[in-house]
Curated annotation (Swiss-Prot):
Gene of this entry: E6
Organism field: Human papillomavirus type 48
Single GO cellular component term: host cell cytoplasm
Domain of life of the native organism: Viruses
Family: Belongs to the papillomaviridae E6 protein family.
Name of the protein in question: Protein E6
Length: 142
């Protein structure tokens, strides 16, 4: 069993006593160094550091988008009408964790309400509810 290392960037920086701005991690997929902007995005999305053979990895934005597309194409389970989701999972909309289907950011309450008021479906992909965040909506041209 591998030793327990930190899985979020804050804990990683504290554990190894390194400034976030000096952090250098490679992408788990393309193996290129993840830029500081992509690391900030990774942190903001509350994604986990991946450990392989005691080596930490993150994920760059380009690979994250490709991963999201791959998961949608290969692990799609179902769609749910946005007005029915709360009854389906028996939680308030504000309490349901929903990530963006394109970039993996967590949707805030206003983004969830956008789906509700615009009758945009939520998707269940690999056991996680997905929608579209405001940044990706603007790229979709809605």
């Amino acid at each position: 069993m591998e030793p327990q290392f930190p899985t979020d960037l804050d804990s990683y920086c504290k554990y190894f006593n390194i400034s976030f701005f000096d952090l250098v991690l490679k992408c788990i997929f393309c193996k290129f160094s993840v830029s500081i902007v992509d690391l900030a995005s990774f942190h903001n999305k509350r994604l986990s550091v991946i450990w392989r053979d005691n080596t930490p990895f993150a994920c760059c934005t380009k690979c994250l988008r490709l991963t999201a597309l791959y998961e949608k194409d290969n692990f799609f389970v179902c769609t749910a009408k946005s007005h029915l989701l709360t009854g389906l999972v028996k939680k308030e909309l504000s309490d349901i964790n929903i990530r963006c289907q394109h970039c993996y950011s967590f949707l805030d309450y206003l983004e969830k309400l956008y789906h509700l008021y615009n009758d945009v479906d939520f998707l269940l992909i690999r056991g996680t509810w997905r929608g579209v965040c405001r940044n990706c909506i603007s790229h979709e041209g809605r």
